[in-house]
Design a protein with these regions (language model features):
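Surface-exposed, charge/polar-rich loops and edge strands
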Residues: 1-415
């Protein structure tokens, strides 16, 4: 069973939400954050991308940066840019992209559920990134940014969400830059709060869609606080961390593509000939070619697009990891032909989220920056959940979710 609870969210007043809300800390660099926050002292970047308040070149992991985050978080509250609700609520957060809306419940997720595997992971985390987020949680004593969860479809929750979203929202705005819609309601009726809690308690698992490092950091800090408290009871606020939970049937995973700097000493002809061992290779010409389904790949090289279809026998349908296109391409193209052994550390490879389109792959190859691009058919939510359920881990850079959660709509304090 998944344990969740409502919480007293800290939120911007309605008239300030568009100034406060920001993109997540990990989808933009310091230079981009400086540009987006320019002239806006209320931007959440002054809490989550603190290096922008220091001279250019300041190490974002400097202790002074973390201290400034806590100082600014308090300042935002003192100035009334962030105000705590006086009652424990759940919240509904809807995102609209390209005319499609997905509705998430904002809840306090239970730290022990993360530790004992009820909250399921599909990615490995890096300790240095965990520690960075842990410092941020510690100094602020809060989850400033939420994690993105998926839950099994649930009709009773659908009914409650429909009831609230028929009413006027607390926030409703279009984010600058991406044009995505962000809408927000408060679930404040006790009977509905009780039903939501009870329905989650029936769920065997929740699934991290995006935010593995934030989840790990929040859970580890919660466990730290429990250990440090001689009177720990288990119901303290630090036992919970903020998550936005979406029904799995509303989520779409976007392709996550690869670009590589060189052909590992091969000529284009030798490279294509090497691919012929495991793939049916078809030239598609100058027009962009998109993968048509599982085990079909799109390759861009020398101004031409190619279709690659994995030959029978090159993968195992009964292996939940081996059957993934990201695994097939990693083993049979990136490793076997291009000599790229470690996707995490090899400097010859870069990754491009599908939201940028296949034109971005063409652009990076045509510019001479990269030599070849590889586009993959996206994994499904079912594949993700099956892999998490079996305790397996997806290869690096497998999933890309869009739209990203907007930060700053609500914050969860740990006391």
């Amino acid at each position: 069973m998944a344990i969740i609870k409502p919480f007293k969210g800290i939120r911007p007043p309605q008239n300030l939400v568009e100034q406060v809300a920001s993109r997540p800390y990990d989808v933009l660099n310091s230079e981009e954050a400086r540009a987006e926050a320019e002239g806006n002292e209320k931007s959440l970047y002054h809490i989550i991308k603190l290096e922008i308040d220091f001279p250019v070149g300041m190490d974002e992991h400097d202790e002074r940066v973390y201290a400034k985050a806590a100082e600014n978080f308090q300042l935002f509250q003192d100035k009334g840019w962030l105000v705590q609700d006086n009652k424990e609520n759940y919240y509904i957060y809807a995102q609209t992209m390209n005319g499609k809306t997905q509705y998430g419940l904002v809840v306090g997720a239970y730290v022990p559920d993360y530790m004992n595997g009820i909250i399921k992971k599909h990615e490995l985390t890096r300790r240095d990134k965990e520690e960075d987020r842990m410092k941020h949680v510690r100094v602020n004593n809060a989850n400033i940014e939420p994690v993105f969860f998926a839950y099994p479809d649930n009709e009773k929750l659908d009914v409650i969400i429909k009831k609230y979203t028929a009413n006027k929202p607390v926030y409703d705005f279009i984010a600058p830059g991406d044009g995505f819609g962000h809408t927000f309601w408060i679930v404040d009726q006790d009977a509905d709060i009780a039903t939501i809690t009870a329905e989650f308690a029936k769920m065997p698992a929740l699934y991290i869609a995006d935010g593995h490092h934030r989840s790990a950091a929040a859970a580890l800090v919660g466990a730290e606080k429990a250990k440090q408290n001689p009177n720990h009871r288990g119901d303290e606020e630090y036992n919970y961390f903020m998550a936005v939970c979406f029904p799995a049937n509303q989520l779409t995973i976007i392709d996550y593509n690869r670009v590589v700097k060189d052909l590992n000493g091969l000529t284009p002809e030798q490279f294509l000939a090497a691919l012929d061992k495991n793939f049916i290779v078809e030239e598609k010409g100058a027009d962009i070619y998109k993968p048509s389904g599982l085990h079909n790949f799109s390759l861009y090289l020398g101004g031409k697009w190619y279709s690659l279809t994995a030959k029978a026998g090159t993968y195992n349908d009964n292996d939940p990891i081996g059957v993934l296109d990201v695994t097939i391409s990693s083993h049979l193209i990136l490793d076997e032909v291009l000599g790229i052994k470690d996707l995490r550390s090899d400097k010859r490879i870069d990754f491009v989220g599908g939201i940028r389109g296949l034109g971005e792959l063409k652009k990076r190859v045509d510019s001479g920056e990269m030599k070849v691009a590889l586009a993959l058919y996206p994994v499904s939510m079912k594949q993700l959940m099956d892999i998490a359920d079996t305790g397996n881990i997806m290869p690096p850079k497998t999933t890309w979710f869009e739209p990203k959660l907007r930060s700053g709509l609500v914050i969860h304090k740990l006391d």
